[in-house]
Amino acid sequence: MKILFVLISILYAVYCFSSEEDVDSAYLANELEPVEDINSEQYAALEPKEEQGRSCADMGQDCKDDCDCCLNIATCNCWFGRYFCSCTFGDYQTCLRKKGKCKRNRPQSCPRSNLNRKKG
């Protein structure tokens, strides 16, 4: 039974890949007609807007210093001194440091973890 299931799965996978290649090659050869959108007039007035540059960098994006990173606790981590810098997660101390030195992307509040607080 397991062998039959594996055989059917392999045949189905081969069928899917071969039919996908036929559609891709037909599309590249312009053999398929373009689909006409009946609501195209409705969206004709909307023009695509240019993406504006952000004033801060998300996690994993390039940065020059901690003030370039968006999140309050994000820090600019560099490999080999000042090369290959990117924004990574920091901690509460990072937020306090950013609050003191950053003029742009300055944190409004610094989150504290609830792990060390005593209850009761």
From Swiss-Prot:
<keyword id="KW-0960">Knottin</keyword>
<dbReference type="GO" id="GO:0005576">
    <property type="term" value="C:extracellular region"/>
</dbReference>
<feature type="disulfide bond">
    <location>
        <begin position="69"/>
        <end position="87"/>
    </location>
</feature>
<keyword id="KW-0800">Toxin</keyword>
<keyword id="KW-0732">Signal</keyword>
<dbReference type="GO" id="GO:0090729">
    <property type="term" value="F:toxin activity"/>
</dbReference>
<comment type="similarity">
    <text>Belongs to the neurotoxin 05 (agouti) family.</text>
</comment>
<keyword id="KW-1015">Disulfide bond</keyword>
<feature type="disulfide bond">
    <location>
        <begin position="63"/>
        <end position="76"/>
    </location>
</feature>
<feature type="disulfide bond">
    <location>
        <begin position="56"/>
        <end position="70"/>
    </location>
</feature>
<keyword id="KW-0964">Secreted</keyword>
<protein>
    <recommendedName>
        <fullName>U13-lycotoxin-Ls1a</fullName>
    </recommendedName>
</protein>
<feature type="disulfide bond">
    <location>
        <begin position="78"/>
        <end position="85"/>
    </location>
</feature>
<feature type="signal peptide">
    <location>
        <begin position="1"/>
        <end position="16"/>
    </location>
</feature>
<feature type="propeptide">
    <location>
        <begin position="17"/>
        <end position="54"/>
    </location>
</feature>
<feature type="domain" description="Agouti">
    <location>
        <begin position="56"/>
        <end position="95"/>
    </location>
</feature>
